[in-house]
UniProtKB/Swiss-Prot annotation:
It comes from Prochlorococcus marinus (strain MIT 9215). Homohexamer. This is Uridylate kinase. Belongs to the UMP kinase family. GO terms for molecular function: ATP binding; UMP kinase activity.
């Protein structure tokens, strides 16, 4: 089963690759080539991108910044990533539009739901930047929100690990991977996949979440085709 309309959540860290900070052009190129394969299958793809490779609001808040101010700085970081991703996508021939939750008309369109859906219908990729435009909400929650708004069939969370585990697989060799689990299990066991607001939004709107490894070439197109390459939350 190939999904027809997908919301892909890319963390800022995914764009960082092995670098300690910023954007790795090779990773952007690899993601762009994968996205091209997806678009060629006539799949409608929207992307929400994080900003943790540049600035993380929670970290800024922990370091003494006002939380709302820190979150706004984080939103600007996501716009930088969105524009960089647009550049990478267009270099491989993928028509792309960036829409931001905070208006900045000189560099991106404002987020307008109907316009975003029209872009998708025309075969363009839409990259959402600026989070949801409000502090105190993560980009994972933005992904769940935008997925519900554009009627996406699935949220695909691209991460550094190949699915959801019962504990950190980088620290514990006996970590158990889940092939599937329920929203309720994630919420009740406080499994660190997404924040609880994002999980609850997906649960309330019956949008499944696929968690998979972004660094394995071809995984985006495999996930879109419904191949069991990660963990499915439903």
């Amino acid at each position: 089963m190939t999904y027809k309309r997908v919301l892909l959540k890319l963390s800022g860290e995914a764009l960082m690759g092995e670098k300690p900070y910023g954007i790795d052009p090779a990773i952007v190129q690899s993601i762009a080539e994968d996205v091209l394969k997806v678009v060629e299958k006539n799949v409608q793809l929207a992307i929400v991108v994080g900003g943790g490779n540049i600035f993380r609001g929670l970290k800024g808040s922990a370091d003494g910044m006002d939380r709302a101010t820190a979150d706004y700085v984080g939103m600007l970081a996501t716009v930088m990533n969105a524009i960089s991703l647009q550049d990478g996508l267009e270099r491989v021939g993928v028509a792309t539009r960036v829409q931001t939750a905070i208006e900045m008309q000189e560099i991106a369109e404002p987020y307008i739901r109907r316009r975003a859906m029209r872009h998708l219908e025309k075969g363009r990729v839409v990259v959402f930047g600026g989070g949801c435009g409000n502090p105190f909400f993560t980009t994972d929650t933005t992904a769940a929100l935008r997925a519900a708004e554009i009627n996406a069939e699935v949220v695909m969370k691209a991460t550094k690990v190949d699915g959801v585990y019962d504990c950190d697989p980088n620290q514990f060799k006996d970590a158990k991977k889940y092939s599937s689990l329920s929203y309720q299990r994630v919420l009740s066991d406080e499994i660190a996949v997404m924040d609880s607001t994002a999980i609850a939004l997906c649960k309330d709107n019956n949008i499944p979440i696929m968690v998979f490894d972004i660094f394995k070439k071809g995984n985006i197109s495999k996930a879109v085709a419904g191949e069991p390459i990660g963990s499915l939350i439903s």
